[in-house]
Amino acid sequence: MSDSIVRTPWKDYMGEVPMHLEYFDGSMFEAVEQIAKKYPGNIAFTFMGKSTTYRQMIREIEQCAKALKTIGVREGDKVTIAMPNCPQAIYMFYAVNLVGGIANMIHPLSAEKEIEFYLNASESVAAVTLDQFYNKFEKVRERTKVVNMIIASVRDALSPTIKAGYMLTEGRKIEKIPEDAPVIMWKDFMKLSHSCYYKTYKVKREGADPAVILYSGGTTGTTKGIVLTNKNFNALGQQVIAANPMFRVGDKMLAAMPLFHGFGLGVCIHTMLSQGGRCILIPRFTAKSYAKQIVKYKCNFIAGVPTLYEALLRLPSMDGANLSSLKGVFSGGDSLSIELKKKFDKFLYDHKASIQVREGYGTTETVTACCLTPPHMFKEGSIGLPFPDTYIKIVEPDTDREVPYGQEGEILLAGPTVMKEYMNNPEETAQTLRTHADGLTWVYTGDLGVMDEQGFIYFRGRAKRMIISSGYNVYPGQIENILDAHEYVQMSCVIGVPDPYKMQKVKAFVKLAQGVPATEETKQVLMAYCRKNVAKYAMPYDIEFKEDMPKTLVGKVAYRQLEEEELAKIKAAEEK
């Protein structure tokens, strides 16, 4: 389209980054396969010290695809993947794509009720998870359409030396799966490829075909499945590399952001594998392990949420570390405070890195990032400039009327990474995706921001009531619904409390049902109930009992008042 139709003040400030690209129109697997044919001997990823070449990876993906065909997975079928960043997750993700299926990506630490919801909402016919999560899946399986449950183990992907150590430590803690359990163990599953008699197990898919389902709160804060296409992911890969002209084939990305997150899957995994990079897979994040891998592998690119960078600053093991290999350090998932950016930029300088942290912004409705601070031009507090072929408007909230430069409004996004739809939800799809007179389909983000005269974007806040804890989106309404369902609870309200490490932590206020005592025992009953029904990252750190909830004039719970009261408590405690 002509840039004259949409205001693009950023076009003169892109530096080496082009305004437009030609996009690959095949499947995600085909994008990776092209690279594998070009650089078969290059390392695709390294997992706990064991490296896999592109040639080996493609062979494993094709074997996995044949096994999927053997168990009956067909074009358009959904397969749920609930895995950490490990080789089997990568093989399964691309194998599902290869047979024409749709990968339904979920958090392996999800609570039982959430797993049941994800399996049913997607109508998944198969699911793959780790042995340590087997029990949660087995408890809900009979209430879903899942025919085949595939169980992998981290130990199967380890080198013999590392495996021995793993089995003496972490491996000992995992409960043994019964021999007669109705599951297929990973090794047995892969052997099923020998029984695949389909000549055409590879299904040709187009760029516009649905390929992945990721989950987010949508515009109302209730969980929505976001349907993303092959082109969404392939375009993102090309955009990310275009926005980083310093990238070279073989460059290493530390992949600690999880696979069920657009940032982790889209940037840390698919961008690297579709453009010739190398992923250093981190299955379970700790700041200590993250820091160790950066130094050990001389990583070129790292990505994380602000809490990660806050943690790295405090690590004694980083003293004297040489980070001169770094070409790009990206922050997303939450606002990066000016103070933290300054601290981490100094940290990078002190550790011989000649770069700064570059902040980005995006939504799951656009896979992940759609704008990024350019490497040649930093503006304090800005989240950067749009990627090639991505357009950003700032409008009066919920309208198509653009506001002047420098004025706050709702952030709208358009471009090749815009989702296909919300799964089975045409009403919210229509509310979020709207076509304007310029012919573009725009995502109404519900986020507030400002654009300056040079096209730099400044994030101002989330219009929706959402808590961000360690980069994860936590929707208060979901936790309130769970709490309110307990017989002890009459009413609840959940808020985010500022936390120096997590940015925000979750706190619940509860008005108890008549006759229920406000005791420590009652609190522990409710905390145990939450642990069973709420994902680990969304778990309230505290429950406070209230005789009554503050209300607004229209009778709604005044959650902002509770937030203000909590902030006042924190301030008073700090002044003591």
Regions found by a protein language model. Give the residues of each.
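AMP-binding/adenylate-forming catalytic domain of the ANL superfamily
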Residues: D3, A152, K532-V557, E575
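Conserved AMP-binding A3 loop
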Residues: T53-R55, K202, A211-A235
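AMP-binding/adenylate-forming catalytic core of the ANL superfamily
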Residues: S110, A127, I302, G415, ...
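Conserved pre-ATP/AMP-binding loop-to-beta segment of ANL
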Residues: K176-Y215, T222, M246-K252
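Conserved ATP/PPi-binding loop(s) of AMP-dependent carboxylate-activating enzymes
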Residues: L385-D389, R401-L433, V474
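Conserved AMP-binding/adenylate-forming core of the ANL superfamily
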Residues: G41-C86, I90-Y94, A111-E116
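Gly/Ser/Thr-rich phosphate-binding loop
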Residues: C299-G304, L313-E380, Y391
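Conserved AMP-binding/adenylation subdomain of ANL enzymes
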Residues: N234-K252, F260-A303, L315
